[in-house]
């Protein structure tokens, strides 16, 4: 069995952070074994590939420009998806646009329905307030009539003081 290292040990040998090693493995599709805990296990060939990547990055290359020539069997090439025909793309785009227009129309209709409902509710509230106001006006008119009758029947209740009492009160006021 070949010697295997964990991510931390490889990162120490390369002088980089363990997450950097994990990022390189993921980005370049390096095929590594994992242990029962899910930790990556590296062999000598993996270390050689990672050193080649590190050297190219140190020389100023960007990750997308790095070329791996050694141990290519360790690298999983991403599958390329076929291009979509222009007519098919335009047809799908047209379908999406029609669907979006339909959804916008439904949304607008729903908004109109909500506003109509709110207006009807407000109208009902206004009608109820108007009825309450009319009722209050009638009650107020009745109270005013009763007050006028009381003033006619009982003049003293309206604040009229007989003249005799007024003169008596003047004697004691300063």
Curated annotation (Swiss-Prot):
CDD domains: HTH_MerR-trunc (cd04762)
Cell compartment(s), UniProt: Cytoplasm
SUPFAM superfamilies given in the database record: Putative DNA-binding domain
A GO biological-process term: asymmetric cell division
Coiled coil: 84-157
Keywords: Cell cycle, Cell division, Chromosome partition, Coiled coil, Cytoplasm, DNA-binding, Sporulation
Principal subcellular localisation of the protein: cytoplasm
GO cellular component: cytoplasm
A GO term, aspect molecular function: double-stranded DNA binding
Superkingdom of this protein's organism: Bacteria
InterPro entries xrefs: Chrosome_anchoring_RacA, DNA-bd_dom_put_sf, MerR-type_HTH_dom
DNA-binding region location: 7-27
Similarity section: Belongs to the RacA family.
Function description: Required for the formation of axial filaments and for anchoring the origin regions at the cell poles in sporulating cells, thus ensuring proper chromosome segregation in the prespore. Binds in a dispersed manner throughout the chromosome but preferentially to sites clustered in the origin portion of the chromosome, causing condensation of the chromosome and its remodeling into an elongated, anchored structure.
Name this polypeptide is given: Chromosome-anchoring protein RacA
Originating species: Halalkalibacterium halodurans (strain ATCC BAA-125 / DSM 18197 / FERM 7344 / JCM 9153 / C-125)
Record lineage: Bacteria, Bacillati, Bacillota, Bacilli, Bacillales
């Amino acid at each position: 069995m070949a010697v295997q290292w964990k991510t931390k040990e490889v990162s120490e040998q390369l002088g980089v952070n363990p997450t950097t090693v994990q990022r390189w493995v993921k980005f370049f599709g390096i095929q590594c074994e994992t242990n029962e805990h899910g930790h990556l296990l590296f062999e000598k060939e993996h270390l050689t590939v990672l050193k080649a990547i590190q050297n190219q990055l140190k020389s100023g290359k960007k990750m997308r420009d790095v070329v791996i020539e050694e141990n290519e069997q360790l690298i999983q090439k991403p599958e390329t998806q076929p291009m979509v025909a222009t007519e098919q793309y335009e047809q799908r785009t047209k379908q999406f646009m029609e669907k979006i227009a339909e959804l916008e129309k439904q949304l607008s209709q729903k908004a109109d329905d909500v506003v109509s409902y709110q207006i009807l509710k407000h109208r009902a509230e206004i009608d109820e307030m108007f009825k309450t106001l009319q009722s209050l006006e009638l009650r107020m008119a009745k109270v005013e009539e009763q007050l006028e009758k009381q003033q006619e029947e009982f003049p003293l209740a309206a604040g009229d003081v007989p003249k005799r009492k007024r003169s008596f009160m003047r004697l004691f006021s300063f």
